[in-house]
Amino acid sequence: MAAFEYLALDPSGRQQKGVLEADSARQVRQLLRERQLAPLDVKPTRTREQSGQGGRLTFARGLSARDLALVTRQLATLVQAALPIEEALRAAAAQSTSQRIQSMLLAVRAKVLEGHSLAGSLREFPTAFPELYRATVAAGEHAGHLGPVLEQLADYTEQRQQSRQKIQLALLYPVILMVASLAIVGFLLGYVVPDVVRVFIDSGQTLPLLTRVLIGVSDWVKAWGALAFVAAIGGVIGFRYALRKDAFRERWHGFLLRVPLVGRLVRSTDTARFASTLAILTRSGVPLVEALAIAAEVIANRIIRNEVVKAAQKVREGASLTRSLEATGQFPPMMLHMIASGERSGELDQMLARTARNQENDLAAQIGLMVGLFEPFMLIFMGAVVLVIVLAILLPILSLNQLVG
């Protein structure tokens, strides 16, 4: 059976969309008529992109971490309840409210019914199910423990999503504060200051230096502010485009690592992500060398990723994991000590998971400290700007009062 997307009209004339499984489009139309729906369009499961490699179908837009965690959790629950994987996929598709996810899961189910493994079926959708996910599922199928492995994958995906949300929420307030501050300063300089200071200019009196400087800045903002804003947006777009070039991206990532506080945050983020990914792969039975290659792909910083790839090569040649990672110079000593302990005790996956949690807690503390320092800095900055503007307006008034006196 294959999956078909349909567009139909109900008895009241409203359009209905959905996905049905059937042997042919003709059977789908018959099923729709039995449900008192008038079929308008029926076609095989729609995909976003079709490559030229043997007609392999892929979705150009992947699943969000939240959707992936939810689908994985549902599959884990159903598989552990002794439901066959094809039935679990059908139930998860029926449970989803997203037509796109329904289509994807039913397409995976169709591949499973053709005799492919679950991991092999997921390989048809690489943007939705990353290599880490597929390798872990393959290891679970090979070991005969697919249910527990899916449960671990759901936990891993949810933890990654929660960590990402914590960082985003921690950075949200400073960003809003900075944007609001810049907007207020721009409004004062572009509209308020010119009207107030114009009175003193018309009086013909000699203005203090601070007032003249403020008038100059205000005139520049009024004349060129919009153009400067457009140029800034263009610069951001150009920078993002330049980051697509490998050479520029590596130089930028190297620069970030050299910035004192930023470099530490980047290392903490990437090493924690690497450790948690390596933990779930090794726990699921993926060979260490293969797990290292997969875990390296989740590292965002190219410099650190390249060093980990070199470390994986050393492990392949017989070196210990601890020595290989230590040679990169990118991993904190505590993490290396815990990995060494895991290698000696044979509990590498547990030590990796523990050190990843410790690193994530340390990262959260670092971000909290930065946010705590940033807030008073922005308040002091705003207070200083307002003070300068007030002084620039008051100084001519005081000078005028002295002349009158």
From Swiss-Prot:
Periplasmic topological segments: 190-219, 398-405
Gene3D superfamilies recorded: Type II secretion system (T2SS), domain F
Entry superkingdom: Bacteria
Transmembrane stretches, start-end: 169-189, 220-239, 377-397
InterPro entries cross-referenced by the UniProt entry: GspF/PilC (IPR003004), T2SS_GspF (IPR011850), T2SS_GspF/T4SS_PilC_CS (IPR001992), T2SS_GspF_dom (IPR018076), T2SS_GspF_sf (IPR042094)
Binding site for Ca(2+): T97, E151, D155
Annotated membrane topology: Multi-pass membrane protein
Pfam families in alphabetical order: T2SSF (PF00482)
Any one of the GO CC terms: plasma membrane
Signal peptide span: none
Compartments (UniProt record): Cell inner membrane
A biological process from GO: protein secretion by the type II secretion system
Keyword Glycosyltransferase: no
The entry's keywords: Calcium, Cell inner membrane, Cell membrane, Membrane, Metal-binding, Protein transport, Transmembrane, Transmembrane helix, Transport
Cytoplasmic side: 1-168, 240-376
GO molecular function: metal ion binding
Protein family according to the UniProt entry: Belongs to the GSP F family.
Complex formation: Type II secretion system is composed of four main components: the outer membrane complex, the inner membrane complex, the cytoplasmic secretion ATPase and the periplasm-spanning pseudopilus. Homodimer. Interacts with XcpR/GspE and XcpY/GspL components.
Role this protein plays: Component of the type II secretion system inner membrane complex required for the energy-dependent secretion of extracellular factors such as proteases and toxins from the periplasm.
Protein name in UniProt: Type II secretion system protein F
Organism from which the protein derives: Pseudomonas aeruginosa (strain ATCC 15692 / DSM 22644 / CIP 104116 / JCM 14847 / LMG 12228 / 1C / PRS 101 / PAO1)
